């Protein structure tokens, strides 16, 4: 029987000093021997997805203590990718993932916590905490802050739903007036919560459901809705039960590595492909698998992408559909249910809330259940009132979306496409693979060939696009923006948004060793591995080289013969793998430290410390 980790600091004569300090935090004699649960919050006033979390940690803490545990809260950092976008702030986004994972490990191990509730929400916070949970392997429940309501506005007599990306695209479109841009800007992000489309934050929060580490509704219940409060309360109760199961009954099914097994990672990736999630999820899923010592690679993702159809399209892939619409259709449990009926799910795996995922689906998939709690949960609707307050409204949809032929969520017999929403491409331009969000690619450009327009940084690409250097038919290549070369693997949302604003969204392709925001759509291919800074072929591309992209056949090729490539490689080895033009970029000591250990995207951009 495993002993409570916290006994190290709460029992024995030699721990009198530690107990004295615990007493100074409010603990009493009766608390020593109870499980100490870390409440890992990520409140910050910088990020709309986290601005409402300030009091929610204590909400969970009170429930933990009512259930027989001792709750101790601490905070991690949280970077807003949208605010950090388009300038050197984006260099810090991906590295913050490792800092978050490390900070959780530091706090939990330093104080010998027995279990934890992770209160996350936005882009790097959920992945960082997920990595920490698998690294630590103590009972853990995830509960996120929830998605933002979609913006809604009447423009030129028509009601439209908006999100962050609409504001970015409109601002760069000369055909849209300053007045209309101002209306879009003021309406795009109306409430607290993670941005309203299937961007990285919401994608990752949905994947925690598929991994079995969060409760039904975690990925789709709006931040503003009163129903979301119950998820936080239940997380507090559930984590104490998990802790007691493991430490008092030696039940390893309460542990993250048992729950989030390889089969669960396959489920998460199948969900990601079916819902057309952000390409960033690939990076984070690979990193989390690495932390859990799970053999899950790009080859597994490629295998799944060839089997799983696209069952849902959400903004940015479908501009008029947002997370609130996915929720009305049954949320993630509904998509998982359709995958299960198609034989594409491992349903016999444990979760934090049910003995098996299959049993959970029987209760929470609205296509098959008469469970009143499920039907009530998925009727939670947007309130339509701008606010930064959690649980502040209780609006209900009059009816649920149960249309599996033409609705927001489709069954496997009526998919948006038989090909899934994500694909791994390989070829001489990306020997270790690259990723494209096929759900956001127009069918007319699934096969594309064009001359390379090469840029040595995102900044120069933005200038080139806005100054009309890029024309229809070009393949924009942005290199030296990988984990090591950036450093930090910036998101390329501005270049893709500006291509759209120039009317080139369906007329150009973009390839990079950097990554893309979850808000990106179009023929945008990221994570080219190896990256340029690691000697990848993307560093050998020259202006005008022809590039061939074939998504149906999963290939990406530079039309240059092997002898010429070998000559270019020899010359580049002599010069060093650095950008051809000097960049105005302040690479600090912190960023240099990250770059020194960062691996390419095909390994999740995790750190290679030369050991495991």
Swiss-Prot record:
Any one GO MF annotation of this record: 2 iron, 2 sulfur cluster binding
Note describing how the cofactor binds: Binds 1 [2Fe-2S] cluster per subunit. This cluster acts as a Lewis acid cofactor.
EC number(s) reported in the record: 4.2.1.9
Major enzyme class: lyase
Pathways involved: Amino-acid biosynthesis; L-isoleucine biosynthesis; L-isoleucine from 2-oxobutanoate: step 3/4; Amino-acid biosynthesis; L-valine biosynthesis; L-valine from pyruvate: step 3/4
Listed Pfam families: ILV_EDD_C, ILVD_EDD_N
Binding of Mg(2+), residues: 81, 123-124, 491
PROSITE patterns xrefs: ILVD_EDD_1, ILVD_EDD_2
InterPro entries cross-referenced by the UniProt entry: Dihydro-acid_dehy_C (IPR042096), DihydroxyA_deHydtase (IPR004404), DiOHA_6PGluconate_deHydtase_CS (IPR020558), ILV_EDD_C (IPR056740), ILV_EDD_N (IPR000581), IlvD/EDD_N (IPR037237)
Regions that span the bilayer: none
Cofactor(s) listed in the protein's UniProt record: [2Fe-2S] cluster; Mg(2+)
GO terms under cellular component: cytosol
Residues the record lists as N6-carboxylysine modifications: 124
Annotated active site: 517
Keyword terms of this UniProt record: 2Fe-2S, Amino-acid biosynthesis, Branched-chain amino acid biosynthesis, Iron, Iron-sulfur, Lyase, Magnesium, Metal-binding
Domain of life: Bacteria
Catalysis: reaction(s): (2R)-2,3-dihydroxy-3-methylbutanoate = 3-methyl-2-oxobutanoate + H2O; (2R,3R)-2,3-dihydroxy-3-methylpentanoate = (S)-3-methyl-2-oxopentanoate + H2O
HAMAP family, A to Z: IlvD
Protein function: Functions in the biosynthesis of branched-chain amino acids. Catalyzes the dehydration of (2R,3R)-2,3-dihydroxy-3-methylpentanoate (2,3-dihydroxy-3-methylvalerate) into 2-oxo-3-methylpentanoate (2-oxo-3-methylvalerate) and of (2R)-2,3-dihydroxy-3-methylbutanoate (2,3-dihydroxyisovalerate) into 2-oxo-3-methylbutanoate (2-oxoisovalerate), the penultimate precursor to L-isoleucine and L-valine, respectively.
Subunit field text: Homodimer.
Family recorded in the similarity comment: Belongs to the IlvD/Edd family.
Full protein name: Dihydroxy-acid dehydratase
Organism annotation: Rhizobium rhizogenes (strain K84 / ATCC BAA-868) (Agrobacterium radiobacter)
Organismal lineage: Bacteria, Pseudomonadati, Pseudomonadota, Alphaproteobacteria, Hyphomicrobiales
């Amino acid at each position: 029987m495993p002993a409570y980790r916290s006994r190290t600091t709460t029992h024995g004569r030699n721990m009198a000093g530690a107990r004295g300090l615990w007493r100074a935090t409010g603990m009493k004699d009766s608390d020593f021997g109870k499980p100490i649960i870390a409440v890992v919050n990520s409140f910050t006033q910088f990020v709309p997805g986290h601005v409402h979390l300030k009091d929610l940690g204590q909400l969970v803490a009170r429930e933990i203590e009512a259930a027989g545990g001792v709750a101790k809260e601490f905070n991690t950092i949280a970077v807003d990718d949208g605010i950090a976008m388009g300038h050197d702030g984006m260099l810090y986004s991906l590295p913050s993932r490792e800092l978050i994972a490390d900070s959780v490990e530091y706090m939990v191990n330093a104080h010998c916590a027995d279990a934890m509730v992770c209160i996350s929400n936005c882009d790097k916070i959920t992945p960082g905490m997920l990595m920490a949970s698998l690294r630590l392997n103590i009972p853990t429940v995830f509960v996120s802050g929830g998605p933002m309501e979609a913006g809604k506005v009447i423009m030129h007599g028509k009601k439209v739903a908006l999100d962050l990306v609409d504001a970015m695209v409109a601002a760069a479109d000369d055909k849209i007036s300053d007045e209309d841009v101002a209306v879009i800007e003021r309406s795009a992000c109306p409430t607290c919560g993670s941005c309203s489309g299937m961007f990285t934050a919401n994608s990752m929060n949905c994947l925690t459901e598929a991994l079995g580490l969060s409760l039904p509704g975690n990925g789709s219940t709006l931040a503003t809705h009163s129903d979301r409060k119950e998820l936080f309360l239940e997380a507090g109760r559930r984590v104490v039960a998990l802790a007691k199961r493991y430490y008092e009954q030696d039940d390893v099914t309460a542990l993250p590595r048992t729950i989030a097994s390889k089969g669960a990672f396959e489920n998460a990736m199948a969900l990601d492909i079916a819902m057309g999630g952000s390409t960033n999820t690939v990076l984070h899923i690979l990193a989390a698998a690495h932390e859990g010592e799970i053999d899950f690679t790009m080859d597994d993702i490629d295998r799944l992408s060839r089997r799983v159809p696209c069952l849902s399209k959400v903004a940015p892939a479908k501009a008029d559909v947002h997370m609130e619409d996915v929720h009305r259709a049954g949320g993630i449990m509904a998509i998982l249910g359709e995958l299960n009926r198609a034989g594409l799910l491992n349903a016999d795996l444990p979760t934090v809330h049910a003995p098996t995922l299959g049993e959970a689906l029987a209760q929470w998939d609205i296509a098959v259940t008469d469970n009143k709690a499920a039907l009530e949960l998925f009727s939670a609707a947007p309130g339509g009132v701008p606010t930064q307050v959690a649980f502040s409204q209780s609006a209900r949809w009059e009816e649920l979306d149960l249309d599996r032929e033409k609705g927001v969520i489709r069954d496997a017999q009526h998919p948006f496409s038989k090909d899934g929403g994500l694909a791994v491409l390989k070829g001489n331009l990306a020997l270790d693979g690259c990723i494209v969000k096929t759900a956001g690619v127009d069918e007319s450009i699934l096969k594309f060939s064009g001359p390379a327009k090469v840029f040595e940084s995102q900044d120069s690409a933005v200038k080139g696009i806005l100054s009309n250097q890029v024309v229809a038919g070009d393949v924009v290549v942005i290199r030296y923006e990988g984990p090591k070369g950036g450093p930090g693997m910036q998101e390329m949302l501005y270049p893709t948004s500006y291509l759209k604003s120039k009317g080139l969204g369906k007329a150009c392709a973009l390839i990079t060793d950097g990554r893309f925001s979850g808000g990106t759509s179009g023929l945008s291919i990221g994570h080219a591995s190896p990256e340029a800074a690691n000697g990848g072929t993307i560093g050998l591309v020259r202006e005008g080289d022809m590039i061939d992209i074939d998504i149906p056949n999963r290939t990406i090729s530079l039309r240059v013969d092997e002898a010429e490539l070998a000559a270019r490689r020899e010359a580049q080895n002599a010069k060093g793998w650095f950008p051809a033009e000097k960049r105005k970029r302040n690479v600090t000591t912190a960023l240099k430290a990250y770059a020194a250990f960062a691996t390419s995207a095909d390994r999740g951009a995790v750190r290679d410390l030369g050991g495991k």
